[in-house]
Design a protein with these regions (language model features):
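Domain-level signal for soluble alpha/beta catalytic cores
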Residues: 1-119
Length: 119
């Protein structure tokens, strides 16, 4: 499906299914959503995306909640605090983490042969 197709579906009142809360699913699997699990558990993110696609989602979202320099600066008191928590230079890795998240969503589509699902 293209974005034009999506708009047409919405404009004509057709049902469009979006995925649910990725953070909620991460919690349901026994992990904390705050860590995103992009690096520690990429298969978890991949499987969540695949589950939503298999359930009929037309659109899946990326696991990028709070992935920004601002949110990291709000969460950590300083660069030293980040280093003490084992995430030194986290603010410099925002682009990498966002890219990883998008790639996992795309990998889920490809694994299921569902390039028609939008991200």
């Amino acid at each position: 499906m293209s974005y034009t197709d999506l708009k047409q579906k919405i404009d004509t009142g057709e049902v469009v299914l979006l995925d649910g809360g990725i953070g909620t699913e991460i919690l349901r699997h026994g992990y904390t959503w705050a860590s995103h699990q992009l690096k520690n558990e990429p298969k978890l993110n991949l499987e969540i995306h695949k589950d939503y696609i298999s359930a009929g989602a037309h659109v899946i979202t990326t696991n990028t909640f709070q992935l920004s320099r601002r949110s990291f600066r709000n969460h950590f008191a300083s660069d030293e605090h980040m280093a003490l928590q084992g995430v030194a230079n986290l603010t410099d890795r925002v682009g990498e983490l966002v890219n990883d998240s998008v790639q996992l969503a795309d990998n889920a589509r490809k694994a299921l042969g569902r390039d028609d699902v939008l991200i």
